[in-house]
Amino acid sequence: MSVLKEFKAFAVKGNVVDMAVGIIIGAAFGKIVSSFVGDVIMPPLGLLIGGVDFSDLAVTLRPAQGTAPAVLLAYGKFIQTVIDFIIVAFAIFMGVKAINRLKREEAKAPTLPPTPSKQEILLGEIRDLLKEQSKPAAPITVDPARTL
């Protein structure tokens, strides 16, 4: 099999396509969460703390010298990233929890036995007839008082 055919067989498998869709949706979801944290959560939080902009929080390790920029330890951006992660992890947890609940409900649902087909019913009747025919006949008893 050529490499192209093998790749095509691999790429169109359900799991690979599902994974690709999940990665694309996950990347888009990550951007939404980052915007939510940076634009919606952090500004009010910074205002409550005293007008602090978290993205500007940093410790200067070495000040700028000439054309060389300052070396900063930007812990404010790290705090935003941690909050991003917590929100994404919580959203994933809630999604997995919902899926697990649906699986449990699906497992609890009683499944009805399949109805036999006409052929299966006919085969069952033939089996029963063959069993009846293979039984030995009941012995004949003669009552001497009723003899002619």
Curated annotation (Swiss-Prot):
Domain of life of the native organism: Bacteria
Gene3D superfamilies in UniProt? Large-conductance mechanosensitive channel, MscL, domain 1
Q: Which keywords does the record carry?
A: Cell inner membrane, Cell membrane, Ion channel, Ion transport, Membrane, Transmembrane, Transmembrane helix, Transport
Q: Which locations, inside or outside the cell, does it occupy?
A: Cell inner membrane
Classification via Pfam families = MscL (PF01741)
Bilayer topology reads:
Multi-pass membrane protein
Q: Which cysteines are joined by disulfide bonds?
A: none
InterPro entries in the record: Mechanosensitive_channel_CS (IPR019823), MS_channel (IPR001185), MSC/AndL (IPR037673), MscL_channel (IPR036019)
User: Which residues span the membrane?
Assistant: 9-29, 79-99
List the protein's name. Large-conductance mechanosensitive channel
- Organism equals Pseudomonas syringae pv. syringae (strain B728a)
Its gene is mscL
